[in-house]
Amino acid sequence: MNLNEYFSNTRYFKNKIIVISAKNEPSKKIKRFLSRENLGLKMEIGYRNSYIAVIDNKRGFIFEKADKDIQECSYKVKNKYIDIISAGFESGDKSSIKIDSVEYSNNRRGLNIAIFHYKSLALVDKFFVDTCEDSSLTIRR
């Protein structure tokens, strides 16, 4: 399955929180991610930039930020925080998505994505997509 197929049915993500953290070089093939518009994302990512995004479909909240420097964000859901770090190739080369010190990022090149259920923050799915080299945007676990 590829990234466009995965995010084609937005109703499935109604009560979910989608978290994205980029590592290394996420920009080369990102324009092929056509379903990003279904999620409300612009994904204006420069070469070797850091990038984070949070899509909270329950609350209708979308946040995204890209920059050459390391990006960090803590998103509060009820009494817990989702801590997100993205560092592009030249700013640390790292991806992290944590809840209560538990790591959910695959920490691989491209986009690292974790999806959580809104009520419990239980992990629904996690995967990565090599948006640097993989033109088909294949989901890898």
Where are these regions (language model features)?
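Short acidic-hydrophobic catalytic motif
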Residues: 1-141
